[in-house]
Amino acid sequence: MKILVADDSRAMRMIVIRTLRQADLAGHEVVEAEDGKQALDLVLAGGADLILSDWNMPEMTGIDFLRALRANGVATPFCFVTSEGSDEMREQATAAGAIGLISKPFTAEAFATALSSVVTA
């Protein structure tokens, strides 16, 4: 399984990858993107089986990235991992087609719960 982690913070991308490992969701190919535009280009060029994205990024926000994917017919499971988690953001995420929104600070258990139906061994 190919997992794309999109976040403008390299440190946060590393934390997300470590948390995947702690949630027993390791062993998958992980691809990183620094912003929504780079992430969109990577997905359109090579696909992904799961996308974990920050909400606020330069060039293209996470929600705009998700909307662009759906507009291009890409139905890859998409989950936000972000420092904010307002009800309005959750509603926008769901309306755009996200499977969930994990708020920072997060735990391995939160990842396991949110992603277990998507991530295969």
Residues covered by each model-derived region:
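Acidic catalytic/metal-coordinating carboxylates
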Residues: D35-Q38, T61-D64
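Active-site beta3 strand of CheY-like receiver
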Residues: G46-L52
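Two-component/phosphorelay signaling modules centered on CheY-like receiver
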Residues: R10-V31
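Receiver (REC) domain active-site loop signature in two-component systems and cognate sites
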Residues: M57
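C-terminal output helix
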Residues: F106-L115
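Conserved Asp/Asn-Gly motif in the active-site loop of CheY-like receiver
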Residues: V30-K37, A108
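Active-site residues of response regulator receiver
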Residues: D54, T82
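Alpha4 helix (beta4-alpha4-beta5 surface) of REC/receiver domains from two-component response regulators
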Residues: D64, G85-G100
